[in-house]
Regions:
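Helix-loop-strand module that forms the ligand-binding subsite of alpha/beta enzymes
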Residues: 1-68
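Glycine-rich phosphate/pyrophosphate-binding loop and the adjoining helix
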Residues: 59-115
C-alpha cells in the first residue's frame, strides 16, 4: 500500500477507539504500472485496517463478465487499473465496468443499511 494511504489509515485510531466505522461498508481499489505489478497484494494489505475497524468489506462479484475476461486490471478483491510502464494508459473498458460495478455495489449496500 502507498505510504500516504498507510499514514492516512494510521491517523484513524480515534475512530477505532470510538467504533465510529463499525458496520460501515468499505471497498478498496488500486493501480499499478504492469499487469503483475502487485495489484492483488496491494488490495489485500489495505484490508486489515478496515477489518480492525469492524467494517463490512465489499469486493467484486465473480458473475461480472468483465472480471473473467479483462486483460488489464480487476480482481475479486477490488477494482484495479494497469497504467502501463509510463503510467499513461487510460482505463480500459473492462476496468471502467469493474469500477462502476464496485461503486454501484457500495451504494446499494449503503442504501440497504440506511433502510
Amino acid at each position: 500500500m502507498a505510504s500516504e494511504m498507510k499514514y492516512f489509515l494510521d491517523q484513524t485510531t480515534s475512530l477505532w477507539l470510538n467504533g465510529a466505522l463499525h458496520g460501515k461498508p468499505a471497498c478498496v481499489f488500486t493501480s499499478s504500472g504492469s499487469m503483475h505489478g502487485g495489484q492483488e497484494s496491494t488490495l489485500l494489505t489495505m484490508l486489515p485496517p478496515l477489518f480492525h475497524h469492524g467494517m463490512m468489506i465489499l469486493g467484486l462479484n465473480n458473475a461480472i463478465p468483465a472480471l473473467s475476461h479483462t486483460k488489464t486490471g480487476g480482481t475479486p478483491y477490488g477494482a484495479s487499473h494497469v497504467s502501463g510502464p509510463r503510467h499513461d494508459q487510460s482505463l480500459s473498458q473492462d476496468e471502467k465496468v469493474l469500477c462502476e460495478a464496485q461503486g454501484k455495489r457500495l451504494g446499494e449496500v449503503v442504501k440497504k443499511l440506511q433502510a
